[in-house]
C-alpha cells in the first residue's frame, strides 16, 4: 500500500503535503525572488503593490485623502485579489489529498505562470483596463504563492513580502535569548537566522531585477518571473517524482 504523503501540521493545525514542508531551501529562495520581482514590477507598471497588503492600504488611504476614487478602487481590488489567493490555494490543495503522488507546489507554480503570462500579454496588448487586469492577475498569482508556501525547516516564511520575513527574523532571535529550555528541534537559531536572511536577500534581489526588467522591456519584462517559475516547477516535479520512486522501492 502506497504510503500517504500527507501529515497534520502540529504548528498550524492544518493539513499540508509533506513534500511542501520538506522542500529544499533553494525553492524558497527562488519563490522569494519571484515575490520581489512581481511586487517591484507591479509597482513600476501599475503603481500598486501586487505582493502584499500593507503598502496598498497606505496607498489606498492616500488616494481617499486625495479624493482619487479610481486609484482607491484599484488598490482595494488588488488587496482583495491577493487575499483571495490564500484560501484559494487551500482549496486547490484539497484534491491532492486523494492523489498523494501528485505535486501540489508545481501545480500552484503552473497557475502562477499562466496568470503572469496573461498579465504581461494584457498590458502589452493595450486592451481596455489593461493596467487594472495586469495588477489583479499578478496579485492573484502572488497570493496563491503566499498561501501555498508558508513553512520550511519548521519556521514560517513569507516569499511575497518582507514584513513577515523581518518579523520572523526578529522573533527567532528574541526566542534565542528569551527561552531557557528550548526543545531540541528548535535549538538551531543560527541556521534559521541565516535561512531567513537569505530569503530576504533573494526577495530584495528579485525586486531589483524585476524593476530593471520592466523598466527596460515594459510589460514583457514580467516574463522573466514566469521563466524562473517554470524552472522551479520542473525542478520540484523531478525531485518529487524521484522521492516517490525511492519510497516505493523502500
Where are these regions (language model features)?
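Alpha-helical transmembrane segments of multi-pass membrane proteins
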Residues: 2-250
Amino acid at each position: 500500500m502506497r504510503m500517504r504523503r500527507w501529515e497534520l501540521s502540529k504548528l498550524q493545525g492544518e493539513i499540508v503535503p509533506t513534500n511542501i514542508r520538506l522542500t529544499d531551501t533553494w525553492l524558497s529562495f527562488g519563490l522569494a525572488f519571484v515575490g520581489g520581482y512581481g511586487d517591484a514590477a507591479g509597482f513600476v507598471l501599475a503603481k500598486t503593490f501586487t505582493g502584499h497588503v500593507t503598502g496598498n492600504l497606505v496607498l489606498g488611504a492616500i488616494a481617499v485623502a486625495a479624493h482619487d476614487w479610481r486609484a482607491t478602487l484599484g488598490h482595494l481590488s488588488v488587496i482583495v485579489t491577493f487575499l483571495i489567493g490564500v484560501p484559494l490555494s487551500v482549496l486547490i490543495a484539497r484534491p491532492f489529498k486523494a492523489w498523494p503522488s501528485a505535486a501540489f507546489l508545481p501545480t500552484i507554480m503552473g497557475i502562477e505562470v499562466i496568470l503572469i503570462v496573461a498579465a504581461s500579454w494584457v498590458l502589452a496588448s493595450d486592451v481596455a483596463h489593461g493596467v487594472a487586469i495586469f495588477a489583479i492577475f499578478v496579485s492573484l498569482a502572488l497570493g496563491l504563492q503566499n498561501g501555498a508556501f508558508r513553512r520550511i525547516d519548521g519556521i514560517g516564511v513569507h516569499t511575497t513580502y518582507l514584513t513577515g520575513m523581518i518579523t520572523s527574523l526578529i522573533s527567532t532571535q528574541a526566542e534565542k535569548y528569551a527561552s531557557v529550555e528550548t526543545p531540541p528541534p528548535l535549538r538551531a537559531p543560527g541556521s534559521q537566522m541565516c535561512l531567513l536572511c537569505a530569503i530576504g536577500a533573494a526577495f530584495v534581489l528579485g525586486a531589483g531585477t524585476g524593476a530593471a526588467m520592466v523598466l527596460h522591456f515594459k510589460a514583457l519584462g514580467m516574463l522573466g518571473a514566469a521563466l524562473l517559475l517554470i524552472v522551479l516547477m520542473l525542478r520540484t516535479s523531478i525531485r518529487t517524482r524521484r522521492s516517490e520512486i525511492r519510497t516505493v522501492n523502500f
